[in-house]
Structures are given as structure tokens and as C-alpha cells.
Design a protein with these regions (language model features):
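Short C-terminal domain-edge/linker segments immediately following a structured domain
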Residues: 49-54, 84-87, 150-152, 177-178
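Intrinsically disordered, low-complexity polar regions and short flexible loop motifs
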Residues: 163
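C-terminal cap/loop subdomain of S1 sulfatases and analogous C-terminal strand-loop tails that border
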Residues: 26-33, 39-44, 64-67, 71, ...
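Histidine-centered active-site microenvironments of extracellular/periplasmic hydrolases
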Residues: 5-64, 74
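Short, well-ordered amphipathic alpha-helical segments that serve as non-catalytic structural scaffolds
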Residues: 1-3
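C-terminal structured subdomain/cap of oxidoreductase catalytic cores
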Residues: 167, 171-178
Length: 178
């Protein structure tokens, strides 16, 4: 409370402060809920890889209490986004997997990253939580999410615009994508 009050009440701080709260993965099984999403920590389903990013900045955000449920924005997008947002130079020879999306972070845009996001499950987690044969690899590209084993077996494809809970595998209907 005191820190947020200080920021709200100081015009210079209010105009130039952005507080971010985020997590690196979904909840541990039994320690929380992934809401409508399938899976838990160590799973490559959305319940394991999706987590909230809370941004607070009374002088920077387009709207207060705004929830963006549609943009694809990854933790790897934070560094280039924050560098651009603050007008800081990018380090020489720095290559980022992330994309700069300051408008999305500030709630002024619903833009999503353009490049795919790749995921790999650690090899020692094949039967974590007693679940067998969890997918080893995943890629999120636009509205599509593809999961499979290391050898490409057991493909799963989900349309994330219509099936956020990853309940309907449409891989057989979209061989051209698989």
C-alpha cells in the first residue's frame, strides 16, 4: 500500500513508473488452479506454460482494471519491450527471441507477437505428477498450438482461438499444419 500510494501521489513517479508482477509457469498440481486451462507446472499445455502478467502504472497504462485475454505475449518479450518503452538502447550484438510490444503491455493495443514460441519439456519430467506420456515439444504460432513427442509421434493440434482449454485435438483435420 505505501509504495503504491507514494507512486500515485508523486506526479513524476506516477508518469514514469511501471510495476510488473509475473510468474514463470502455471501452478503446481494441488497448489492452485490453472482456471480453464489444461495441465499444470511442467506440462506444455496452457495450464503449465501460461501465467498472468500484471502491469500497474497509473500514468502509463491506457486503462485501469483492463484484462487482455487475446494477445500472445511471452516473458521473452519483456526485455525488448521494456528497452523500447524506456527509450533505452539495445545492447550491441544482442539478439532477442522476444519481440517489442509496448502498446500491448500498456493496454493500448491487442497486438500479438508474430514469431512462434517454442517449448521443450525437461526430459526428466516424462511422467511428472503420475501423468504418463506428456508431450515433449510444443510450438505456439498465431492461433495454433502444436504438441508432440521428441520423435514427432502423437501429434496434437489445437485452435487456441476456439479451444483455449485444449480439449479438441484437430491434428487429423489439419495434416498440412502438422
Amino acid at each position: 500500500g505505501k509504495l503504491f500510494d507514494l507512486i500515485r501521489n508523486d506526479p513524476a513517479l506516477r508518469a514514469n513508473t511501471l510495476v510488473l508482477v509475473c510468474s514463470d509457469n502455471g501452478p503446481e498440481r494441488g497448489a492452485g488452479s490453472a482456471g480453464p486451462f489444461r495441465g499444470f507446472k511442467t506440462h506444455l499445455y496452457e495450464g503449465g506454460v501460461r501465467s498472468s502478467l500484471i502491469a500497474w502504472g497509473p500514468g502509463l497504462l491506457a486503462k485501469q482494471n483492463h484484462v487482455n485475454r487475446t494477445s500472445v505475449f511471452s516473458a521473452i518479450d519483456l526485455v525488448p519491450t521494456l528497452l523500447d518503452l524506456t527509450g533505452s538502447p539495445h545492447p550491441k550484438n544482442a539478439n532477442y527471441d522476444g519481440e517489442s510490444l509496448p502498446g500491448t503491455l500498456l493496454g493500448k493495443s491487442a497486438a500479438s507477437r508474430k514469431a512462434p514460441i517454442y517449448f521443450r519439456r525437461p526430459p526428466d519430467r516424462d511422467s511428472f505428477y503420475g501423468d504418463k506420456d506428456l508431450p515433449d515439444l510444443a510450438v505456439r504460432d498465431g492461433k495454433w498450438k502444436f504438441l508432440c513427442e521428441y520423435d514427432g509421434a502423437e501429434p496434437e493440434l489445437f485452435d487456441m482461438e476456439t479451444d483455449r482449454g485444449e480439449t479438441k485435438n484437430v491434428a487429423t483435420q489439419h495434416n498440412e499444419l502438422v
